[in-house]
Amino acid sequence: MIGVVVTGDAKFGMDIEAVERALGRVLVMPKGKSKAQVRKMECSYASVSDLPGVDLRFENGRFMYVSVDKPTVTTRSGFKVGDPERMVIDRLKTDSTYERYDDRYDETKMHITVGKIKVVGTGATQKIQGGYLIQFISKQDRVILIEAGEAAFVSLSEREGDCNY
């Protein structure tokens, strides 16, 4: 199941207020930004008031992605930051969408992804146009980051073209 428990009833694509209602928690906008400003920004992050290490990404005011870098929450399957990579592999390797690969920029990191994506184009024009992924990034055989959301945003985890809050 794709998602992390922190998202509760929040669904990707919801606006900021709907996410807050679904979570039953207050979102903290970037310093100096109001909810109204974030709704109009091409890209921005918000954090969850009482959950350190949880960041939500909004694109044009819509929830697209969640990132967790502390063991404050778990996935719906029970995984959390700090878990052994082997545990994730053993539980997910039979999923038909399972992939494990090296980080392009840091040879000490590994990525494990599951989920469905839609890719259009070929070669240099190929791009992700839909679907949802959950990704586990590990270093030294421990999960250090969990990301979930619309596939195009999860695939940005190596920070190509990432937004500036």
Where are the predicted features?
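A short, polar/proline- and glycine-enriched secondary-structure boundary/capping micro-motif
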Residues: T74-F79, S155-G161
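Solvent-exposed, acidic/flexible segments
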Residues: G8-I16, S77-E85
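A cross-family detector of function-defining hotspots
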Residues: M14-E59, E85-E158, N164-Y165
